Every structure is written in C-alpha cells, then in structure tokens.
C-alpha cells in the first residue's frame, strides 16, 4: 500500500500549500496529490477551485493570487527540491487546455518518472497523452462509463 497526501497534508495546513506539501514529505508520505491550473498570467498554480472570492483564477494575475496564499508549481520545486523523490500527482483543474503546454514546458528539464497527471476534464485528457508523452496519465471520474467515452 502507498500513502498519498491529498492536497498535501491538508488536515493541518492550507490545501495545496508549500507547508502542506512540506509536512507530507516530513511525515514520510509516499506521494502528494495537488491541484494545478493556469492563472491569468500563465503560471501553473496550485489551487482547487476555478475562483477565489470574486476572482476567476484563469483571469487573475499570479501577483494577486499570491495575496491569497496561492503558490505556483515553480515555487514548490524551488522551495522543496526533495519533491522529485516523491510520487507527485497533478490533478489538472479548470477548462484551459493551455495548461498541458505549460506543463510540458515546465517538465522539459525536470524528472517526470514520479509525476502522474489526472483530470476530470475530458478535453484535457484527450490531448494530454498525445501532447505530453512523459510521465503517466489517468482519468478521475465518478461515472463508470466515462472511460469508454474518453477512449473512443
């Protein structure tokens, strides 16, 4: 059995935060799942919802989002270099399919053997395997017939 910290160690720290991820690493979790999406200025940020307060994430600059305590994937790798030794599950949120290209660019010179991509968004899943062959992918769904729809 492998233990994955959902949104980092989110029972003690804010979901998808540097501290939540750091604490999950400290506690010895095998992996960490975080939610990622593109913000209005193109950074890959860690946040679950498509909006915060009255701001849509996809239309809001990273500078504004940082005021809410939102971090970027770049910051995770900069501040937590040990993340490369953990399984990292990136749950891709939102509807902006440009996130796939941003992830490809981000991981161009980083190890991806322990990175897994998942999403509820069929459009993202359809292009992810063709657009980005490194790492692995899986679909997150609540509906059993979704798999048949995505593979057709």
Model regions: which residues?
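Phosphate-group recognition and catalysis centered on beta-loop-alpha active-site segments
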Residues: 1-152
């Amino acid at each position: 059995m492998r233990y994955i910290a959902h949104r980092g160690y989110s029972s003690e720290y804010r979901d998808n935060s540097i501290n939540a991820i750091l604490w999950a690493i400290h506690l010895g979790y095998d992996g960490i799942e975080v939610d990622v999406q593109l913000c209005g200025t193109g950074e890959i940020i860690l946040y679950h919802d498509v909006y915060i307060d009255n701001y849509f994430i996809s239309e809001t600059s990273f500078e504004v989002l940082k005021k809410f305590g939102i971090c970027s994937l770049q910051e995770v790798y900069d501040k937590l270099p040990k993340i490369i030794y953990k399984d990292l599950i990136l749950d891709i949120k939102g509807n902006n399919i440009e996130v796939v290209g941003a992830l490809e660019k981000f991981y161009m010179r980083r190890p991806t053997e322990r990175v897994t991509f998942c999403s509820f968004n069929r459009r993202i899943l359809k292009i992810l395997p063709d657009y980005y062959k490194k790492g692995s992918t899986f679909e997150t769904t609540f509906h059993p017939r979704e798999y048949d729809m995505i593979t057709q």
